[in-house]
């Protein structure tokens, strides 16, 4: 059925609602008046320009009487005068010869379409911004009233008002062109387009839009070629001529102003209301408006330029008008005026009478109000007026002269046209003139019929065609098509693709070598070019033959190696150290000596083992098991204990009771040290505060300041022992660099060797900078000048007493370092270690005894026996004391201030030693000792004395001797031959330098034409050539081919289209729908009958029924059921039936599933598939890649069911081999290929002739001399012949002797045996408070002791049994409490330095999967790095360094072998010889006068810069200038305040002071009743009290019912709570805690610090930060930039150094250290910047 679209709405019109009028098809509902929207019929419509109107609104009947002073008439008059009047036409016609501008440009055509969208967007933007600052004050009653009035009027009224409003003499509002443009704007509007879309979707689409469908639609719009090119075409032709001043823009803007309701009423209110007068008034108003609009100076300037032919476009009326329109449309200008006008009304709510805005809104409402409108109508209804005499009629007649198109054209034809139309004008000029006259949109559309005859105006540009084209996508066929039909089109001219093409051309090796290929045959390379000579020399250096030749010569000379050489002895010693056999041998020797004394601790361990022994336990059990009076609740407690130990994590972590180790054992201390070094937690603890802090460049000012501040406030550094402070010499500090440089300058050998030859051959000018610098250096290094200044200083005199600080400090340091002094003090103070006559004299022991008595059950029972007969005892005192003690044990404060628990003698050696250690650790005292050295001279590093002193210090260092081998860290020395060679290799491997060198060489080099590389390059050029590629394609394309409609690709595409088509699918589905169940009843359907029968067979009820019937009959073959079951099982398990399931039941032939299965089997059938190919047998071979083959491949891929159905994860990534990246990688591989490089070197090696006098040749000779073994031994003999004096008292001998004693195992054991008896201080077990305490605790915890006490007291009825429950509750609380979990050392007595304890902590930290992976969370989503890149190599190296596997491997598995003749070492030696300054200068002296260096040579320039950088004079001058700048450092400066505050924080005195203040706040109650905790404990004690329980039991035992709170149930509940993981993890709500308690605050703070959520909350701001797809344009650009930066030697440090220097300069001066807050602010800023 042919359904035609409606002329108004565009939808299809069916016969029932069809009207055919005005040569068009309409819906009945759409056939309405254009003005009032009244429904029309065939009989009552009036046609005007093919649009229907009612009789009342017929545009032809101009019967409406217009009021003369309406704003519309004034606008009508102003509009033709200002924009399209006669004067402007004259100006335009005069300017036509000067300016030629095509009015049909893309800008003009696009402007009307864009204008409504742009206005709408700008309007809503302005509305949103204006909304933002409106105050939220209370609404005024007037405002509320007006809002309601506006709502009642509504938008429909204003729409109806808009259309009849313009029914005056100006027909712009009702012209067909205006209505058509308005309709086109509505159609083009995205809002109008989308309105009703959801309803239409629900009506016409069966499937709701899924997210995938919506996403694909959005993607299709993004990928749409039409959308993309449409925007691009609109913007493509724009140059520097702004769209704001085009006539189309002016017309559209003016039309918007005319159509604007607000503008209409504003203009009317401001100018016209209340005025009445003749036409002169209108003229005056017009003149005034023109004067206001264009200014006074415009006519004068216009008259000046009027007669001139060419005048600037800046003063044309069109330009002025456009400028004014631009200002009106400009958002910036609008906001400027708006901000000026913004007054109090915007920020305060005035009453309605005072608010000007409200007054204006009220007046507008009155105008819009229908009541006001009808009032005037009622008042004027009864008057009769002669229309011809009214001023309005005269005004209209006057206006009609100006608005008449005939009059306008008459003036134009009479006055203007004859000036320009003549013989000399060609058609282009006439066309330009005609285009200029079409500036008015109204005149343009009125004159459209004339233009279409004269000029070729294409139909595709008409509004109706554009509208129809916009409606094409809305058609049902296009709208309902499947997504799969939309094909992806690659837009070839997108900026990204264009940029990629440019990049590919830039990266193209062919383009790169194109110029070279043209010019390479035009150069002749001389034989003596330095580069050529250097290449030959390099070829010799890299020659394998030469290399082996030198090695053979060296090998044949031999060398002398004695058995007592230092290297052999060191190797033996290291081998013994690393030897597993030696290690085990020493271990076996010392194994029996570890427990060589009757140690009281061992006895204690044996005693504890007996107590915990099962045998001992059973002995006691055998004795007591026959007694009936055992309290039954003991079993429950025992069970609860066992359950708690099983469920508790604490016992899992406390494995330390298994054995006892001596704390002074050497192995224990050594293990402690090793574990401290290995501790991952301690290592990472220093870095915890840096979590989340941004990345900073190493070495920057802020980073160094932050490091220093971190060291100052570090608790670890403050508390650490003296021997852990390491002295590290900063190798790259200015002092060290200066010292190195001075050493080189002072070296007489190097100085004379380099200058000896040039002294007599060179004349230097006196004012040469180097000469002046040498003089200055000589003055600086002059011994005489140095001593003269010293003598001058000495003459002034100074006083140095024997009691000065420096002497005293030196003495003190000597005494500290002296072993004799140390042992002397130790011997003196050895007897003072205990310092108490008896236990009562020692406060600590007394306190321990008192604690043991308090905790002792026996003591408690003794006291109870004394007081049990007294009724008035206050039991809460015991609880109070116990609670205090428990609080002390549980609180963290008491843990940290442990030194308050005992009183130490002031003469105690430990106290003195601690004071001395703290004094040494004090940073202030440490720096005070160094202050006197400021300004002192320096010692040249590398001199003999310094090296001897260093070596001696290392040999006698106890710390270095005792440290673990794994603690030795690798330090890279920057100026080693390896590092220098690495730098040289890096510069050689840099692509940029390589290409620069290649560019230099390639113009002097003539390669042979048949080289393999050249042939390969040509082949590659042919392969990569786009021209060759397109040429072959063009040839193939020109050959032509025949493709019929019945060809395979077409048929396959049709079939695939039908398969994919949703419509076809549904059509087939509808056809087959009635055939699915083709039976009249269930019995007729074989499938259903089979299912019912199978169900009945499987039914247990039916089975049993049949069994009941047949069980009495003997002849039933019982094996039938099993047989059927086996068959069924076989069919289920059989693979054959699985593949061919159809024959098992009978199906209808027209069943949909059956036909689908047949189709599937046909597709899967191998025989059918191959039978199709039988007709092709004997057909000739088809070349792969032809059009037919590719077409068939594509068709088979399209119809492939497996590919269509496959999972997205099965798609594999395929690399395109001809991408620029892969081509670049291939070429880079060829360039960096060592084999090809050497092959090219071998070919080129025999074609060079070396000149003998070249500097490189001379340097090679010098290098050969330097590498010569004969020369080396000769110089050694000469040096040895000079001799030197080395006495026995020399420092090295003394150091060696001392180190021999230290390293001696015999002396070590001798000292150990001497000291062995001094390890345990007390004479017996009773003198050792620790062991006494352990014994006491063992007795308390002993089951035997407990049972003895129970036996002695079980017959007494008055014993309060609730104490057992209270102890149990305390223990359970302690186990469940997280507090006690963290401070678990109070529950048992364990040696804190126990090896197992530290090892268990380490093992748990290592086993924690969460902690391990939490460090890696920050790395999620980070991209990959190319292999062999510097970052990847450094990461590998770091991984090897921190590798746990490599770290933990046995020492004997690490084999160190130095191959003396390895290429690396030989290469390093050669490189070192190359880098040697002395040899370089000595070898260069001969070639100095044979070579002329270009003054601006890069090497020369770089040498000058290096000389400037290394210049001591410049260095000192810059230092003097910096020092002269000075700075102000007051006592109230922020660094001082920060240091003071940090000192107070770290101060132990402040800490104790704060502790003493808070100590009284911990309990803070007058009695037990005020303390909620104690009340809680008492209540718990009463509830758990056995005494109370027995009282109640005695009352209720005669009653049969059992209470729910019986002890068994309570105990089970308690056990469940203890065993429950929930209560274990949430222990905090169980106790009642004082909120002001110090321990609670501390715990809260600790939990906040440990909170993973809070830690990760800092990272939430980075959530949602997008990722960049690999391979995209920006990623490739960034990667290329990184490669270029690496190639130029730029690191990240250089990139960020400037920004950090600026920020550092902003925050503080160069000499003031920042405080902590400033550091945090700077870090936050940098994190934001990064």
UniProtKB/Swiss-Prot annotation:
The keyword Zinc applies. GO terms for cellular component: fascia adherens; muscle tendon junction; Z disc. The modification Phosphoserine is found at residue 1081. Residues 4-64 form the LIM zinc-binding domain. InterPro entries: NEBU/NEBL, Nebulin-like, Nebulin_repeat, Znf_LIM. Keywords: Actin-binding, LIM domain, Metal-binding, Phosphoprotein, Repeat, Zinc. Pfam families: LIM (PF00412), Nebulin (PF00880). CDD domains: LIM_N_RAP (cd09446). GO terms for molecular function: actin binding; actin filament binding; metal ion binding; muscle alpha-actinin binding; vinculin binding. Expressed in cardiac and skeletal muscle. It comes from the Eukaryota. Residues 1596-1606 have a biased composition (Polar residues). Nebulin repeats lie at residues 63-97, 156-166, 175-202, 203-237, 246-273, 298-307, 316-343, 348-382, 389-417, 419-453, 487-521, 522-556, 558-592, 602-626, 627-661, 662-692, 702-724, 726-760, 761-795, 797-831, 844-869, 870-896, 901-935, 945-963, 969-1003, 1004-1038, 1040-1074, 1078-1112, 1113-1139, 1144-1178, 1183-1206, 1212-1246, 1247-1281, 1283-1317, 1321-1355, 1356-1390, 1391-1421, 1429-1449, 1455-1481, 1490-1524, 1526-1560, 1564-1598, 1599-1626, 1640-1664. One of its GO terms (biological process) is cardiac muscle thin filament assembly. PANTHER family: NEBULIN (PTHR11039), NEBULIN-RELATED-ANCHORING PROTEIN (PTHR11039:SF39). May be involved in anchoring the terminal actin filaments in the myofibril to the membrane and in transmitting tension from the myofibrils to the extracellular matrix. Interacts with actin, alpha-actinin, KLHL41, TLN1 and VCL. Interacts with CSRP3. This is Nebulin-related-anchoring protein. It comes from Homo sapiens (Human). The lineage of its organism: Eukaryota, Metazoa, Chordata, Craniata, Vertebrata.
């Amino acid at each position: 059925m042919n359904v035609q679209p409606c002329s108004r709405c565009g939808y299809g019109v069916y016969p029932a609602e069809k009207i055919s009028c005005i040569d068009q098809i309409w819906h009945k509902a759409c056939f309405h008046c254009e003005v009032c929207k009244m429904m029309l019929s065939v009989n009552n419509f009036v046609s005007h320009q093919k649009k229907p109107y009612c009789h009342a609104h017929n545009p032809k009947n101009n019967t409406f009487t217009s009021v003369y002073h309406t704003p519309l008439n004034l606008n009508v008059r102003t509009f033709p005068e200002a924009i399209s009047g006669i004067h402007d036409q004259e100006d335009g016609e005069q300017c036509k010869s000067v300016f030629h501008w095509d009015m049909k440009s893309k800008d003009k055509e696009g402007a009307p379409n864009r204008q409504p969208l742009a206005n709408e967007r700008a309007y809503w933007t302005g509305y949103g911004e204006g909304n933002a600052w409106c105050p939220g004050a209370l609404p005024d009653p007037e405002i509320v009233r007006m809002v309601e009035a506006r709502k009642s009027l509504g938008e429909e009224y204003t729409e109806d008002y808009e259309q009849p409003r313009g029914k005056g003499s100006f027909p712009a509002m009702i012209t067909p062109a205006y209505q058509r443009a308005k309709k086109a704007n509505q159609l083009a509007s995205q809002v109008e387009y989308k309105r009703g879309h959801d309803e239409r979707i629900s009506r016409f689409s069966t499937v709701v839009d899924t997210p995938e469908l919506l996403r694909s639609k959005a993607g299709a719009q993004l990928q749409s070629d039409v959308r993309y090119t449409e925007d691009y075409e609109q913007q493509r032709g724009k140059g520097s001529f702004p769209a704001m001043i085009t006539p189309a823009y002016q017309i559209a803007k003016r039309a918007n102003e005319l159509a604007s309701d607000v503008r209409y009423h504003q203009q009317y209110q401001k100018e016209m209301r209340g005025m009445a007068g003749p036409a002169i008034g209108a003229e005056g108003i017009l003149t005034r408006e023109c004067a206001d609009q264009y200014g006074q100076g415009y006519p004068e300037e216009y008259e000046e330029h009027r007669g001139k032919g060419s005048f600037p476009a800046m003063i044309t009326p069109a330009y002025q008008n456009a400028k004014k329109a631009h200002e009106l449309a400009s958002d910036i200008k609008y906001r400027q005026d708006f901000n000026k006008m913004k007054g109090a009304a915007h920020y305060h709510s005035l009453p309605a009478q005072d608010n000007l805005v409200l007054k204006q809104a009220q007046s507008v409402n009155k105008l819009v109000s229908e009541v006001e409108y009808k009032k005037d109508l009622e008042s004027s209804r009864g008057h009769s007026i002669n229309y011809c005499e009214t001023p309005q009629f005269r005004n209209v007649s006057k206006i009609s002269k100006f608005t008449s198109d005939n009059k306008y054209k008459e003036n134009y034809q009479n006055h203007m046209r004859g000036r320009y139309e003549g013989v000399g004008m060609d058609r282009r000029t006439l066309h330009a003139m005609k285009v200029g006259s079409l500036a008015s949109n109204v005149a343009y559309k009125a004159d459209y019929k004339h233009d279409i005859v004269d000029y070729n105006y294409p139909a595709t540009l008409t509004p109706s065609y554009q509208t129809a084209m916009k409606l094409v996508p809305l058609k049902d066929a296009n709208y309902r098509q499947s997504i799969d039909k939309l094909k992806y089109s690659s837009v070839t001219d997108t900026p990204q693709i264009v940029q990629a093409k440019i990049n590919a051309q830039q990266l193209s090796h062919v383009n790169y070598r194109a110029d070279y290929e043209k010019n390479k045959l035009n150069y002749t390379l001389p034989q003596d070019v330095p580069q050529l000579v250097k290449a030959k020399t390099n070829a010799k250096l890299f020659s394998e033959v030469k290399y082996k030749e030198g090695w053979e010569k060296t090998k044949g000379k031999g060398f002398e190696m004695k058995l007592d050489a230092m290297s052999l002895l060191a190797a033996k010693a290291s081998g013994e150290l690393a030897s597993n056999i030696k290690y085990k041998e020493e271990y076996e020797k010392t194994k029996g000596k570890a427990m060589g004394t009757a140690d009281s601790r061992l006895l204690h361990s044996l005693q504890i083992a007996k107590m915990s022994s099962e045998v001992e336990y059973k002995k006691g059990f055998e004795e007591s098991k026959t007694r009936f009076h055992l309290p039954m609740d003991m079993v429950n407690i025992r069970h609860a204990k066992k359950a708690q130990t099983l469920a508790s994590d604490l016992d899992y972590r406390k494995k330390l009771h298994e054995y006892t180790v001596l704390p002074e054992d050497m192995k224990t201390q050594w293990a402690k040290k090793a574990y401290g070094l290995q501790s991952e937690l301690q290592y990472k603890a220093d870095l915890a505060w840096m979590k989340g802090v941004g990345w900073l460049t190493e070495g920057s000012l802020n980073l160094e300041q932050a490091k220093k501040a971190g060291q100052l406030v570090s608790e670890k550094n403050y508390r650490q022992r003296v021997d852990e402070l390491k002295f590290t010499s900063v190798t790259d500090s200015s002092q060290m660099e200066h010292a190195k440089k001075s050493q080189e300058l002072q070296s007489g050998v190097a100085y004379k060797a380099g200058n000896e030859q040039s002294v007599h051959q060179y004349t230097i000018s006196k004012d040469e900078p180097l000469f002046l610098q040498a003089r200055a250096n000589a003055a600086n290094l002059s011994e005489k000048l140095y001593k003269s200044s010293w003598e001058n200083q000495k003459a002034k005199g100074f006083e140095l007493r024997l009691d000065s600080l420096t002497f005293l400090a030196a003495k003190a340091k000597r005494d500290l370092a002296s072993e004799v002094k140390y042992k002397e003090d130790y011997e003196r103070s050895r007897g003072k270690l205990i310092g108490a006559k008896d236990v009562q004299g020692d406060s600590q022991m007394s306190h321990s005894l008192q604690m043991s008595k308090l905790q002792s059950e026996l003591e408690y029972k003794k006291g109870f026996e004394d007081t049990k007969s007294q009724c008035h005892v206050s039991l809460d005192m015991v609880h109070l004391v116990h609670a205090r003690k428990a609080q002390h044990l549980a609180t963290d404060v008491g843990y940290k201030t442990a030194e308050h628990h005992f009183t130490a003698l002031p003469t105690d050696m430990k106290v003195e030693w601690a004071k001395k250690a703290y004094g040494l650790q004090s940073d202030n005292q440490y720096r005070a000792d160094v202050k006197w050295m400021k300004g002192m001279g320096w010692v040249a590093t590398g001199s003999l004395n310094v090296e001897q002193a260093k070596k001696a210090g290392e040999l006698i260092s106890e710390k270095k001797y005792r440290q673990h081998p794994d603690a030795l860290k690798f330090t890279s020395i920057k100026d080693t031959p390896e590092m220098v060679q690495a730098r040289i290799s890096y510069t050689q491997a840099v692509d940029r330098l390589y290409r620069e060198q290649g560019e230099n060489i390639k113009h002097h080099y003539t390669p042979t034409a048949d080289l393999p590389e050249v042939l390969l390059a040509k082949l590659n050029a042919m392969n990569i050539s786009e021209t060759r590629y397109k040429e072959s394609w063009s040839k193939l394309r020109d050959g032509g081919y025949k493709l019929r409609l019945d060809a395979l690709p077409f048929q396959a595409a049709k079939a695939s289209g039908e398969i994919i088509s949703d419509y076809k699918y549904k059509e087939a589905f509808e056809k087959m729908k009635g055939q699915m169940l083709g039976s009249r009843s269930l019995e007729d359907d074989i499938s259903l009958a089979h299912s019912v029968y199978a169900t009945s067979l499987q039914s247990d009820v039916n089975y049993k029924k049949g069994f009941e019937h047949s069980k009495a009959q003997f002849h039933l073959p019982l094996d039938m059921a099993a047989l059927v079951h086996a068959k069924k099982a076989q069919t289920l398990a059989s693979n054959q039936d699985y593949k061919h399931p159809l024959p098992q039941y009978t199906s209808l032939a027209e069943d949909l599933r059956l036909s689908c299965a047949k189709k599937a089997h046909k597709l899967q059938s191998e025989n059918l598939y191959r039978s199709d190919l039988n007709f092709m047998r004997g057909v000739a071979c088809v070349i792969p890649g032809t059009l037919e083959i590719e077409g068939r491949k594509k068709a088979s891929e399209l119809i492939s069911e497996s590919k269509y159905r496959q999972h997205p994860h099965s798609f594999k990534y395929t690399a395109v081999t001809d991408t620029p990246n892969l081509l670049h990688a291939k070429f880079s591989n060829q360039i960096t290929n060592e084999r090809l490089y050497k092959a090219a070197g071998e070919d080129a090696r025999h074609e060079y002739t070396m000149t003998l006098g070249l500097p490189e040749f001379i340097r090679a000779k010098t290098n050969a001399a330097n590498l010569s073994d004969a020369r080396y031994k000769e110089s050694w003999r000469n040096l040895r012949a000079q001799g030197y004096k080395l006495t026995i008292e020399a420092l090295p001998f003394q150091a060696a002797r001392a180190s021999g004693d230290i390293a001696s195992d015999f002396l070590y054991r001798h000292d150990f045996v001497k000291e062995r008896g001094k390890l345990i201080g007390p004479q017996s077990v009773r003198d050792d408070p620790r062991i006494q305490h352990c014994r006491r605790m063992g007795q308390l915890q002993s089951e035997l002791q407990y049972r003895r006490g129970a036996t002695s007291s079980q017959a007494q009825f008055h014993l309060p049994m609730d104490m057992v429950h209270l102890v149990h509750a305390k223990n359970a609380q302690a186990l469940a409490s997280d507090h006690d979990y963290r401070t678990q050392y109070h529950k048992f007595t364990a040696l804190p330095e126990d090896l197992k304890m530290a090892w268990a902590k380490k093992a748990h930290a290592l086993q924690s999967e969460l902690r391990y992976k939490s460090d890696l969370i920050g790395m999620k989503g980070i991209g990959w790095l190319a292999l062999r890149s510097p970052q990847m190599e450094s990461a590998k190296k770091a991984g090897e360094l921190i590798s746990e596997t490599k770290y933990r491997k046995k020492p004997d598995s690490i084999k160190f072998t130095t191959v003396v003749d390895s290429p690396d070492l030989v290469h390093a030696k050669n490189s070192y010889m190359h880098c040697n300054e002395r040899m370089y200068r000595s070898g260069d002296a001969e070639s100095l006068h044979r070579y002329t260096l270009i003054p601006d040579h890069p090497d020369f320039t770089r040498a000058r810069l290096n000389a400037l950088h290394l210049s001591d004079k410049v260095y000192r001058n810059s230092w003097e200038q910096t020092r002269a700048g000075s700075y102000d450092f007051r006592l109230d400066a922020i660094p001082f305040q920060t240091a003071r505050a940090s000192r107070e924080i770290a101060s132990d005195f402040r800490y104790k002071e704060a502790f003493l203040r808070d100590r009284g706040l911990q309990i803070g109650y007058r009695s037990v009743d005020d303390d909620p905790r104690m009340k809680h404990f008492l209540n718990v004690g009463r509830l758990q009290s056995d005494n109370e329980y027995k009282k109640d039991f005695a009352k209720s035992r005669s009653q049969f019912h059992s209470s729910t709170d019986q002890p068994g149930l309570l105990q089970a509940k308690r056990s469940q709570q203890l065993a429950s993981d929930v209560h274990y993890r949430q222990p905090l709500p169980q106790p009642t805690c004082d909120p002001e308690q110090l321990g609670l605050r501390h715990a809260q703070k600790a939990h906040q610090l440990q909170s993973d959520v809070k830690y990760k909350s800092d990272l939430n701001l980075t959530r949602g930060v997008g990722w960049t797809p690999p391979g995209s344009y920006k990623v490739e650009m960034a990667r290329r930039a990184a490669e270029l930066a690496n190639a130029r030697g730029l690191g990240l440090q250089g990139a960020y150094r400037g920004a950090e220097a600026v920020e550092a300069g902003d925050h503080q001066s160069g000499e003031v250290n920042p405080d902590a807050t400033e550091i945090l602010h700077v870090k936050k800023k940098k994190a934001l910047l990064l």
